[in-house]
Swiss-Prot record:
Residues 336-340 are annotated as: G2. HAMAP family: IF_2_B. This is Translation initiation factor IF-2. The lineage of its organism: Bacteria, Pseudomonadati, Pseudomonadota, Gammaproteobacteria, Legionellales. PROSITE patterns: G_TR_2, IF2. Residues 138-155, 168-178 have a biased composition (Basic and acidic residues).
């Protein structure tokens, strides 16, 4: 055959040149291009290679042939007939090559099963018993044959044989018991023998990849919220709660498994146990809200100053504001004293001013602090006839803490005993120096009764406001502060909001602390409804979900859903903090109460008209508690007294106190029927004094001892009927019968008892005065000696009061 190119040979054998080049390369022929010629020798070499490779593949595929045969027959035994299905299988194996025959002298030949099955078939026709043995033999033969076909691992071999040897017994049992149910047996055998069984070696290999014990301690990054229970902290560190409690005991803190701990304490515990703490801020939602609102953009315009009038009680703060507003607020206040924060927007001839009137009573410290917090200028009212008082000094401290300027108004200069110079001297001791003395505080003598000096005071206020250059953005979402809040029976929660920037409109979504809502109505300080309020404008807002806490910041939120989420988050956070405080206080009191006597407690259900008054009353009443008696306010709230309040008082044996609120008709009927102690007050002085009297009645009685007389023993008489009788001379006071006595020997008390008998000249007498002789019999005491002294005293109960 003539030489031809690789391409021509590929066309001849009907294959691609590339495939032919690959086969030449596998055959060891050094041809790399399709245009190269291929010789006859190289063709034979390629042909030999192809034959060898194809024969190996076909040998592998056809080295084993299995023929299966199935035969059905019926065996009759009397009236019964049994269907017998006999399956046979024959395997043909191709002989191995000559080289293997030389190395392996005796190849293994499988025993054909056809003859066995034929014999079984013949025997099955004879009787049923022989057929049963034949089926058993066939099953055993197949069971022996099955493991020999599988590849066995030396390590797992014995275990496999044990399992296989057990399996035919179960099948034999089925064959013996259910011989007449051949089809059912086959179906069950098929279910027990799935077509594809997972290899035990691979399964064991998977099982070997189990838990690996760490060689070094696992250090975890523990995410810590602002408060967390001990159980949750232990779960985050994957340790038992007892380990965490033990670690905290080493740090000096006694905790329980359900107790909440703060973030800092949890971080210390995590570091102590070898992990890394990661502090999480839970107020991300609020921060995102503030970032969304951002700084209010727009042109800042001048606004009216917010002026807070502060000073001691009865120094004329509200009277001064009355004269400025040309109204009579003082006459409507209970007792003539202010007990709420009043916000008023006043138009004067000189300009607009917003006044905040704060209480002067010592119980309203929080109100005064709130007034100083949201103000621009503080007007300190001092009575010229009274001088500087404790609440005056407190007002100065609030103004300094808020870093606001102070204008001093010396009131009541119309009185003859007024001394303004003394006021300046007293205030100078508190670093409040007038301008004429080189200080920076403006002083203005005024009279709220006659109106003297009030115009000059307003000029000074506006002058101070010009110096401060007060400006605010008058458009955009409003921001403000809740000055006061209350619960109105007809209108629901009402909050007095002082707008600090932006403009508040009807329908805005307002978020105030833990409460939110849509502004349904706005009422100005003059009692008229309004539709909008700008900077420095106080308005009453209706529509909040609950009574807000005075002093909270009010923000207009564009999305009601976002406002609801933030309010609920704050409520949950407040609840957690309150429970943590209560639990901490409870744990701290456990050891304090050990060894102490029972502490008398006065339970009170307190209801007030506004949030600020409720806060002040709660603080004032809690301050009345002492080591012996305690005020326990079991419930408090804003609004009228309801039946639930009375039922709570009945259950806890409490007194119901209403401050400027009343009970409705059904509640009064319940109070009369159950006999609950219900008290109304409108002046804080009266309320505190009444609670003091009630606490004084709970105090344990205190007794004073007063020595009535002293007798000296001159002689001792013995009597078989009465015992020892001391003949005495009364040297001091009066000796009375049935009073307690003390027997003194060498001025040391040796006995305390009762004076049983008192005689003079064998006559019983009630008392013996000084300088008179008498006979004294001491009850249950006979060891009286000459020279002893008998001291007679009496106990008197002292009325105790709460300081």
């Amino acid at each position: 055959m003539a030489d031809m190119s690789v391409k021509q040979l590929a066309d001849l054998v009907r294959t691609t040149p590339e495939r032919l080049l690959e086969q030449l390369k596998e055959a060891g022929v050094a041809i790399t291009h399709v245009d190269q010629t291929i010789s006859d020798e190289e063709k034979r070499k390629l042909l030999l290679h192809l034959k060898t490779s194809h024969s190996t593949e076909t040998d592998k595929k056809r080295s084993k042939i299995v023929l299966k045969r199935k035969k059905l027959s019926v065996v009759k035994s009397g009236k019964k007939s049994v269907n017998v299905e006999i399956r046979s299988k024959r395997t043909y194996t191709k002989p191995v090559v000559e080289q293997k025959r030389e190395t392996e002298p005796a190849p293994t030949q499988e025993v054909p099963l056809t003859s066995d099955t034929t014999n079984l078939n013949e025997k099955a026709e004879v009787n049923v018993a022989t057929l049963e043995k034949a089926v058993e033999a066939e099953v055993k033969e197949e069971a022996k044959k099955t493991p020999s076909e599988k590849k066995e691992t030396p390590k797992k071999g014995p275990r496999k044989e044990t399992r296989r040897s057990r399996k035919p017994d179960k099948e034999d049992k089925w064959e013996r018991e259910e011989l007449h149910m051949t089809k059912l047996v086959e179906e069950r055998r098929r279910r027990h023998k799935p077509a594809h069984m997972p290899d035990s070696d691979s399964a064991s290999a998977k099982l070997e990849q189990g838990f690996a014990r760490p060689t070094a301690p696992v250090v975890r990054e523990v995410a810590l919220p602002e408060s967390i229970t001990v159980a949750d902290l232990a779960q985050k560190m994957s340790v038992k709660a007892a380990e965490v409690i033990k670690a905290m005991m080493k740090l000096g803190a006694m905790v329980t498994i359900n107790q909440r701990i703060d973030q800092e304490t949890a971080a210390i515990v995590v570091e102590e146990m070898g992990h890394k703490p990661k502090l999480i801020k839970e107020d991300v939602l609020e921060e995102n809200l503030v970032a969304t609102l951002g700084e209010q953009t727009g042109e800042a315009v001048p606004r009216a100053p917010v002026v807070t009038i502060m000073g001691h009680v009865d120094h004329g703060k509200t009277s001064l504001l009355d004269y400025i507003r040309r109204t009579k607020v003082t006459s409507t206040e209970a007792g003539g004293i202010t007990q709420h924060i009043g916000a008023y927007h006043v138009e004067t001839e000189l300009g607009m001013i917003t006044f905040l009137d704060t209480p002067g009573h010592e119980a309203f410290t929080a109100m005064r602090a709130r007034g100083a917090k949201c103000t621009d200028i503080v007007v300190l009212v001092v009575a010229a006839d009274d001088g500087v008082m404790p609440q005056t000094v407190e007002a100065i401290q609030h103004a300094r803490a808020a870093k606001v300027p102070v204008v001093v108004a010396v009131n009541k200069i119309d009185k003859p005993e007024a001394d303004p110079e003394r006021i300046k001297t007293e205030l100078s001791t508190h670093d409040v120096l007038p301008e004429e003395w080189g200080g920076d505080t403006m002083f203005q003598p005024i009279s709220a009764k006659t109106g003297e000096g009030i115009d000059a005071l307003l000029e000074r206020i506006l002058l101070q406001a010009e110096v401060l250059e007060l400006k605010a953005v008058d458009n955009g979402p409003a921001r403000g502060m809740v000055v006061e809040s209350r619960l109105d029976r007809g209108r629901g929660p009402v909050a007095t909001v002082l707008v600090t920037s932006g403009e508040l409109h009807l329908g805005d979504i307002l978020l105030v602390g833990r409460e939110y809502g849509r502004v349904r109505a706005m009422i100005g300080d003059d009692g008229r409804p309004c539709e909008s309020a700008g900077p420095s404008m106080p308005v009453e807002v209706l529509g909040l979900s609950g009574t807000s806490v005075a002093g909270e910041e009010a923000i207009v939120v564009p999305d009601e859903r976002k406002a609801r989420e933030i309010a609920r988050f704050r409520q949950g956070k407040y609840r957690e903090v309150r429970l943590a405080k209560k639990q901490t206080a409870h744990l701290e009191r456990i050891f304090d109460r050990m060894g102490e006597g029972k502490q008398n407690t006065l339970n009170i259900v307190l209801k007030a008209d506004v949030q600020g008054s409720l806060e002040a009353l709660t603080e004032a009443l809690n301050k009345l508690s002492t080591d012996e008696v305690k005020v326990n306010i079991i419930a408090s709230g804003v609004g009228g007294i309801t039946e639930s309040d009375v039922n709570l008082a009945i259950a806890s044996d409490a007194v119901v106190i209403g401050f400027n609120v009343r009970a409705d008709a059904p509640t009064r009927v319940l109070v009369e029927r159950e006999g609950v102690d219900l008290r109304y007050y409108s002046i804080i002085y009266d309320l505190i004094d009444e609670v003091k009297k009630a606490l004084s009645g709970l105090l344990a009685p205190e007794f004073e001892e007063k020595i009535v007389g002293l007798a000296e023993v001159r002689d001792v008489f013995r009597s078989s009927k009465i015992g020892a009788i001391a003949g005495c001379m009364v040297v001091e006071g009066v000796v009375r019968r049935h009073l307690p006595i003390r027997v003194l020997r060498d001025n040391v008390v040796i006995y305390e008892g009762q004076l049983e008998s008192l005689r003079r000249y064998k006559e019983d007498v009630a008392e013996v005065r000084q300088g008179t002789e008498c006979g004294i019999g001491v009850k249950n005491y006979n060891d009286v000696k000459v020279g002893d002294q008998i001291e007679v005293y009496e106990k008197t109960q002292v009325h105790r009061t709460i300081a």
